[in-house]
Amino acid sequence: SIAVAFVPEGLPIAVTLSLTIVANKMRASEVLCKSLSTCETLGSITVLCADKTGTLTKNNMVAVSVTVHGFKSTPVDATKHIERDTPLGSAFKQVQFVGAVCNGASFDGATAHLPLSERKIYGDATDKAILRMSEEMYGVPAANAGWEDHYTVPFNSKNKFMLKLLSTSNKAGISGLNDSNTVDLTTELCAVGLVGIFDPPREEIPSVVKMIRGAGSRFFMVTGDFALTATAIAKQCGIITTEKISSFSDLDALDGQLPVYDTWADNDNQPMRALVLSGSDIMRMSDAHWEAVSRFDEIVFARTTPEQKLAVVKCFQSRDCVVGMTGDGVNDAPALKMADVGISIMGASEVALESADLILLEGFGSMVDAMLYGRLVFSNLKSTIAYLLPAGSCSELMAILAAFFFGLPQIIGNVQMIIICALHDAICSLTLCMEKPEGEMLKSKPRNVKKDRLADGKLLFHAYVFVGLPLTVCCFSMAFWDVQKRGVPFSDMWLKYSGGVIATTQPDFYAETINKGQSVFYFTAIIMQWFNLLSIRTRRLSIFQKPPIGRRETSNLMMFPAMGLSLLIAVFISYVPAIQRIFLTREISAEYFFLPIAFGIVMISADELRKYVVRTYPRSFLAKIAW
């Protein structure tokens, strides 16, 4: 009985269903959670590392310029030079030729009838841009005519190059590649020209970065692109906001001068500290360098390999940060798997999608909604636990302890305990996951996973002492009052471990009277929990400031049907004769419906007074112990 009483059996049900409901709400916001635990972890992210291409940018690369011999031109003007067969035209034609034949992308033949800008291309985004430029300048089929592709070394993020062996001669004259001459092929190359490619940032990214930083999380860029390119995009996206940008050479000089970054401190008035590092810098970094890096506010990691992205994640995790990592490529998979929350975007590679914990179905803009839901679900779960404990644990446990220490009859049946926890409280608690934020959650700091717990001392004090004890006293008073009115005085139960005179001489009458008293206890707990449900919705605000009905931005209309369903279940269990015999329940008088309502009004009024003191006197004792 003690185990049944102390453990709120509805808690696992309520928590699991709450997380499931929140995950479905996130799905409606185009955010797909692959595990329920991810919903809660999202709210505690302190460092978010974002890939550039496809995440911060549109991944819609367009070649906007071609440069040869120091002469810069647009692809359209370069085409005119080719048509006029000028010396510059010959140079531009070489660029066009290399772009067409040394390319891993290919056009979809089914879209050949469409305008060039609408034709579908298979391949890497960079290859697509160059192939489209080559088609615009002279035509890809003309460039490929007469050439055979004998050997290809595909591009990978570690080598950062791709090789193609082309020839018009007999295949018999071609010698195979080995490790030694592969190295030779990467040296003494001839620069044919430069192609400028533009991949515009997504319009929503600057505001998203600002909101995530406003929520107390640091936002970094981790990309395989060149440092200057990454820095330029970072400035456009608002990732770097200061003019002074440190580099690897500055880390030694800054050793010991930078204060440790405290996520939960007031950093608003501190000057921003920016840093740009390349993959080659990361290879040379010591633990002291990593310690210095962890203290910067704005960081761009450029030209990184998969191993280096993984090192970045581990660096911040080892310093008690909760790391979120976004990525869409195969090379991002190790870092996505290692991060506390791996985030990918719809359209990413299969490997990235498989490795991620969270998939953004409509671009990176929905990341703000994901973080908001992560914080909201934690807050609502705390409310759920605070709601479940008074009736589902405190009052039931006191009934068992009273029977053990004071010889009283167990005034609530074991089956009724389980029904209260698994049905009544579970049904009503599910409405708490529908609650809207009490304040602006994305303007507060992320929770500290090492200090902030779902059920801390303040919450337990509120649930067991401030709410649980008054509820228990009311339930006991009502139940034993009914028993005494039916002819069994309290003195005949007090310290009568084996039953008093009536229990001995009239056992059937005594058992029936106790069963009716248990039903009174049962209904009193259920009805008073309604008022606990209305009160537990807020921690600081009054019920009039956040009404459950009448105001769209604060309403929770599911509460009242849940209360009604809870009462219907109790009536069904207690008033249907066949069910009465199974659960040992009995019908109760009308007065036992209305008196708990009066007690509940007193209880919610007391909590309103407590909240008023907490709001008005934030340094008071009540404010310090408020959950």
Show which residues each predicted segment covers.
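Alpha-helical transmembrane segments and their helix-start/interface "positive-inside/aromatic belt" motifs
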Residues: 459-464
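Conserved cytosolic headpiece of P-type ATPases
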Residues: 1-457, 469, 522, 539-627
